[in-house]
Amino acid sequence: MAKSFFAAFLIIMLISSLVDGKSTVGQKLKKKLNQAVDKVKEVLNKSEYMCPVVSSFCKQHCARLGKSGQCDLLECICS
């Protein structure tokens, strides 16, 4: 999945570089791409979504809330 995401990103970057930056189509494409990148960064910065990958993220997230945390499948449970 990471390879296909990277390939799609490269294709989008290629298309955006070919489109003239002054045209409205190029500006709209760049704006949408920036919004998508910002949304991905926002999701990745939330520790509870990283719980299945690394359980320490759940513990850190719950510690910020003043609770103890445990990762249960796809859910971070703070108690």
UniProtKB/Swiss-Prot annotation:
GO terms for cellular component: extracellular region. InterPro entries: Long_scorpion_toxin_alpha/beta. Residues 1-21 form the signal peptide. Expressed by the venom gland. GO terms for molecular function: potassium channel regulator activity; toxin activity. It is found in: Secreted. Residues 48-79 form the BetaSPN-type CS-alpha/beta domain. Disulfide bonds join 51-71, 58-76, 62-78. Keywords: Antibiotic, Antimicrobial, Disulfide bond, Ion channel impairing toxin, Neurotoxin, Potassium channel impairing toxin, Secreted, Signal, Toxin, Voltage-gated potassium channel impairing toxin. GO terms for biological process: defense response to bacterium. Belongs to the long chain scorpion toxin family. Class 2 subfamily. The full peptide presents antibacterial and cytotoxic activities. The synthetic C-terminus (AA 33-76) inhibits voltage-gated potassium channels Kv1.1/KCNA1, Kv1.2/KCNA2, and Kv1.3/KCNA3. This is Potassium channel toxin Hge-beta-KTx.
